[in-house]
Design a protein with these regions (language model features):
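Charged, often Cys/His-bearing segments associated with DNA-binding zinc-finger transcription factors
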Residues: 1-33
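Short, Lys/Arg-enriched N-terminal segment that forms or immediately precedes the first helix
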Residues: 32-46
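Glycine- and acidic
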Residues: 39-41, 53, 58, 207
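Outer-membrane beta-barrel domain signature
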Residues: 46-47, 183
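Short, positively charged, Gly/Tyr-enriched micro-motifs
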Residues: 47-115, 225
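Short secondary-structure boundary/hinge segments and terminal tails
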Residues: 79, 141, 272-273
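Polybasic low-complexity intrinsically disordered regions
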Residues: 97-259, 263-267
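Helix-centered, glycine/charged polyanion-binding patches within enzymatic domains
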Residues: 249-306
């Protein structure tokens, strides 16, 4: 009888089913997450689950690297302490798969953007992030469609007119399939792009924008910088990016609007050979010839554009 009672007490202690470092991480994370501007419950209709708890649950999903909502549901049921830290009443049933799915579909992305902005301002105030050295890049986000399945051998799956039925908003894009600079390997995909501006010192994101996959990186760079500058000044910054951002407008605006500098590799596809005088001297953008013994390597990539 004592053994049965002992086993029951063990089952009641939810702390025994979650490692203490993980529990401490989520406890600290959610204590420092400001969701005060998000209504916790709807003003009318059924009360349902707390919006704050649902948001925290999806943060757990990303931190744990889950790609499926079903994995999140299983994790919360097996780690009730984490569910408690999210804000759920663990004495009652937790949200089902369909509750999470419906919340995600109806959730306004503007709320996430405001949460991120609030956290960035808090981290800046604490001296954890700053904008003196920033970098911008994009990453592909594949749509959940069979046309992205590598096992699909349909010849027309990446034709622009063959829009996936499962996702009418996604678009056809291309991304590099290798990190080697001397290897030109590309892959097509249906989906989106996530453009992220980061603090290169701390490695933490400062701003993000999601677009459809066909949008070129350089076309949204200035919008991202302007949006960031509106709440977190980027004056006197050093802007780091890859050759996809080697565009004259970016050099000019970073210099003129933010008094910053760009570190961007030369995109050879956007350059041309400089005009030469009969003596062989290159002519600069201001139509003046370089001296015979000048170091021609100082020519800015931006000045060699069409």
């Amino acid at each position: 009888e004592l053994i049965v009672i002992y086993r029951q007490e063990i089952l009641k202690d939810i702390r025994l089913f979650t490692s203490q470092p993980v529990a401490k991480f989520y406890d600290s994370l959610f204590l420092n997450l400001d969701l005060s501007f998000v209504p916790e419950f709807p003003k009318t209709g059924r009360k349902g689950f707390s919006n704050h708890a649902m948001i925290c649950s999806f943060i757990v999903m990303k931190c744990e690297g889950f790609s499926m909502i079903s994995d999140l549901v299983d994790y919360l049921h097996n780690n009730l302490l984490i569910a408690h830290f999210c804000g759920f009443d663990i004495s009652r049933p937790l949200p089902s798969y369909w509750t999470f799915d419906r919340f995600l579909k109806n959730f306004d992305n503007k709320v996430l953007s405001k949460i991120m902005k609030t956290q960035v301002l808090f981290l800046s105030k604490e001296g954890i992030v700053d904008t003196s050295f920033i970098g911008l890049d994009s990453t592909p986000v594949s749509a959940n469609t069979s046309q992205n399945n590598p096992k699909s051998f349909l010849s027309n799956k990446f034709k622009p007119g063959n829009q996936p039925r499962a996702d009418s908003d996604c678009r056809l894009g291309v991304h590099t399939a290798s990190n080697q600079t001397n290897e030109k390997k590309y892959e097509f995909y249906w989906g989106y792009k996530n453009h992220v501006l980061v603090d290169c010192i701390s490695g933490l994101p400062i701003y993000e924008m999601t677009t459809t996959a066909e949008v070129h990186d350089a076309t949204v760079a200035l919008d991202i910088l302007a949006a960031t500058h509106s709440f977190q000044p980027i004056t006197d910054c050093i802007f780091l990016a890859d050759k996809g951002y080697d565009v004259k407008n970016i050099y000019n605006q970073v210099k003129e609007l933010y008094n910053g500098e760009c570190i961007i590799p030369l995109n050879k596809r956007n350059t041309k050979n400089p005009k030469l005088l009969p003596q062989g001297n290159p002519i600069c953008v201001r139509r003046a010839p370089f001296p015979q013994n000048a170091d021609h390597s100082i020519i800015s990539p931006a000045t060699m554009k069409e």
